[in-house]
Regions:
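Non-catalytic accessory regions of SAM-dependent methyltransferases
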Residues: 1-28
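Conserved phosphate/pyrophosphate-binding and hydrolysis machinery centered on Walker-type P-loop NTPases
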Residues: 6, 111, 115, 138-142
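Long recognition/docking surfaces used for binding and targeting
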Residues: 17, 24-128
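Hydrophobic pocket-lining residues within nucleotide cofactor-binding pockets
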Residues: 21, 229-230, 298-299
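Conserved S-adenosyl-L-methionine
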Residues: 134-262, 270, 275, 284-285
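Short, conserved SAM-binding segment of the class I
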Residues: 267
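Conserved class I S-adenosyl-L-methionine
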Residues: 285-292
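Single conserved hydrophobic/aromatic residue that forms the stacking wall/gate
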Residues: 294-303
Length: 303
């Protein structure tokens, strides 16, 4: 099976996570094609890469399955990466590909976890597939991410929220800044990772990439919520989130379609604690005559 354009970034994410697994990293080069006995006992003809694909899935599940919060347990991580089982690739070049990723990307990344590596991969794969023009896919440039997080003026005590997380770039940037502010205090850094970074994402692929990204960047308990942040005020998840986590800073780059940016502004203001701060990229369309009233009302509410 050829890897679909929409799954290439997930495949790359899966390999990066699998390489985190010591057993997989040691054994993948020695994995062989299915034996005659395996073929004889299988209901279906097994592809040459069957055992390697299976090992990748097992390593992914082993690494990530128990490291997300209860809001996201409905995501079946084995199912999310299940397409890997059908990748029909000759074993030798397949293992060579993984080896190149390990040597040229994974190992350097282990020494410098600051990059939004999955976000960059997602952008590359989308552009090659000719899908980068989708207005609902917002890929924030690094310099904008750096600026917005600086404008948030984060402290080590802040609870940071992104209501349209994408691949998790803002949360990773915030995690890095807050971890530096902790000045080597391991207990404080652990608290930041475990309890102070939250994100909503409704797209399954982006959600999986964001969780994978946060995992790869050292946050083993990514507080990602699979769902729509534009939820009703009276809903259970809304009430529980606001009551429990009390976010002080919200950093977002919302989808640009129709009046979605304004809706995200209102929702962020509802979720933020009093005297909280919202940092947002707003498209110029929000200043035209059709949206200006909503924009003005949102500004008044923020005051």
């Amino acid at each position: 099976m050829k890897i679909k354009d929409t799954e290439r970034s997930l495949f790359f994410a899966g390999l990066m996570i699998a390489l985190k697994d010591t057993n997989f990293r040691i054994t993948y080069k020695n994995i062989q094609a299915p034996t005659k006995e395996q073929q004889d006992t299988s209901k279906y003809k097994l592809i040459e890469s069957h055992n390697l694909n299976k090992a990748i899935i097992e390593a992914i599940v082993n690494q990530i399955n128990n490291r997300i919060n209860s809001y996201s347990k409905e995501i079946n991580w084995k199912g999310q990466f299940a397409f890997i089982l059908d990748i029909d690739y000759e074993l030798k070049p397949y293992k060579e590909l993984i080896s190149k990723i390990e040597k040229n990307i994974f190992t350097p990344f282990e020494f410098d976890e600051k990059q939004d590596i999955l976000g960059k991969a997602y952008k590359i794969f989308l552009s090659r597939a000719g899908k980068i023009d989708n207005k609902n896919i917002i890929l924030t440039p690094d310099h904008i991410k750096h600026l917005m997080v600086r404008l948030a003026r984060l402290s080590v005590d802040d609870i940071v929220l992104d209501t349209c997380t994408g691949t998790g770039g803002f949360l990773m940037e915030a995690m890095e800044v807050m971890s530096k502010l902790a000045k080597g205090n391991d207990e404080l850094i652990e608290r930041i990772h475990r309890h102070q970074l939250y994100g909503f994402e409704i797209d399954r692929t982006l959600f999986a990439l964001a969780c994978s990204n946060m995992f790869l960047h050292g946050d083993g308990r990514s507080n990602m919520i699979f769902g729509n942040s534009l939820i009703e005020v009276g809903s259970k998840i809304y009430s529980e989130f606001k009551r429990t986590y009390k976010p002080r800073k919200c950093i977002i780059n919302p989808p640009y379609e129709k009046n979605l940016p304004i809706q995200f502004v209102y929702k962020a203001l509802e979720l933020l604690e009093p005297n909280g701060k919202l940092i947002i990229v707003m498209p110029s369309i929000t200043l035209n005559k059709n949206c200006l009233l909503y924009t003005s009302d949102a500004a008044d509410e923020a005051r």
